[in-house]
From Swiss-Prot:
Descriptive protein name: Nitrogenase-stabilizing/protective protein NifW
Biological source species: Acidithiobacillus ferrooxidans (strain ATCC 23270 / DSM 14882 / CIP 104768 / NCIMB 8455) (Ferrobacillus ferrooxidans (strain ATCC 23270))
Known role: May protect the nitrogenase Fe-Mo protein from oxidative damage.
Keywords, sorted A to Z: Nitrogen fixation
Pfam families: NifW
Cited HAMAP family: NifW
Lineage: Bacteria, Pseudomonadati, Pseudomonadota, Acidithiobacillia, Acidithiobacillales
Cited InterPro entries: NifW
Length: 110
């Protein structure tokens, strides 16, 4: 594993990635959307396919491009509109719990 890949593997927050890759960002946008930005970044990376053949310079350029795009997606839009997580893809009103199930659960003490 290259030094860049090791460093990237040690990063955990959106802010860590943005700072490491020298991408300017608005703290308010990141604070509200950090998980969405990272999920979108992951999705973009997944679409790229295998990046094992890339050297550190090419890999860093790819990460900067994809993370910048992920961040910009939430500068110009919002989490509900972008629908990054599965919960946003569920149809309105489809997920529900019947009163009967609530009553049964209450009787069982759950």
């Amino acid at each position: 594993m290259s030094d860049l890949r090791k460093t990237l593997a040690s990063l955990s927050s959106a802010e860590d990635f943005l700072k490491f890759l020298n991408i300017e960002y608005d703290e308010t946008v990141v604070h509200i959307n950090r998980l969405h930005i990272l999920k979108r970044f992951h999705d973009y990376l997944k679409r790229e396919g295998n990046t094992d053949a890339l050297d550190d310079r090419a890999l860093q350029a790819l990460y900067v491009k994809l993370l910048s795009q992920s961040y910009q997606d939430f500068v110009v839009s919002d989490a509900v509109s972008e629908k990054v997580f599965k919960v946003f893809h569920q149809a309105m009103g489809v997920s529900h719990v019947s009163l009967e199930k609530v009553a049964v659960s209450a009787r069982k003490g759950r």
